[in-house]
């Protein structure tokens, strides 16, 4: 019940951002009609990055409005607050991934898009790197606040984008040979491990934070 209330609060704050998601989906559908599979993949990745960054928005709202000091007067623990942020991020990111995967599956049935299986692989890689970006940014926002973290977020996003591009080039070089699957599994395991470490760090940071 506590998590439901915390998630509802964050969703209420984010309601003005939902039209942006709808606009991204429209661009995505537009790219499909033009046959731009590469553009489709880029928009899918952007959608997942946006899904991750929504938690950054809630952290900024909380800091600006002094929500943390207020909610801690209620029967809500600091661990539950941090946990709700990670849960919200996972829900949004998983939702963005599933939406992209379903649409990709549907368009793969269209003859003009046949032979584009590599998009599925890169979508999974994009999910992993979006997860890593979220894992890095939540503890940074909790530790340094919104002003410093905004610059760090931009730098981290550039690094993650570079890693994604490098993985994309390496995967294309392999031409999706059998060694591609172990690569994807390795990236997924590392991203999940990073997320687990991030959660532990965030809990320690928030437990010591003064309001």
Per-range role (PLM):
Residues 1-66, 84-211:
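Hydrophobic alpha-helical transmembrane segments of membrane proteins
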